[in-house]
Amino acid sequence: WTFVMNKEDVATTLFQEFLLKTIRNTLLDEFGEQILALYDTLASVPLIVTSTLLQKDSSDWFDNIETPEKETRDDIIRKSLLDAINSLQGKLGGDVKEWQWGRLHKVEFTHVFGSHSLLRKIFNIGPFPVGGSHSTVNKGDYRLAAPFVNTVGPSTRQIFDLSDVNNTKAVTPPGQS
């Protein structure tokens, strides 16, 4: 796996689902659904905090306070991977080759009038399969509350040819910039 997170990648899908399950399995028992939902509004903070915790051999955050056992980081990783596989089988079926990232990760360019169901098809564009993630140059961030619905992406892309300024290229996706 190249870690590029193309829309065709299967490994990206498993990795992103694993990250999502790891965040929930690490934080949900301490926070509860309501506080985790509020915490989720802080951009990539849940992911950053969980990634930092995973670098430690042990932390009280890994222990599920709702069980009598004391869970470890490795227990959370193991559980999260199994949860991710089960979740993807439910969402995308049993054929792993069909687990392309773009089947889950989509972008839709929405218009304010498109929030009404009768006008959605007239004003909104998409959804389209898209690559990227929270940590790639082709930004494709999403929230825990709406997994894999791309909410943050590049607003413009430009290539400047400094030897020939007239050869400069730019593209802007639909929507406001």
Name these PLM-found stretches.
Residues 1-177:
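C-terminal/peripheral segments of proteins
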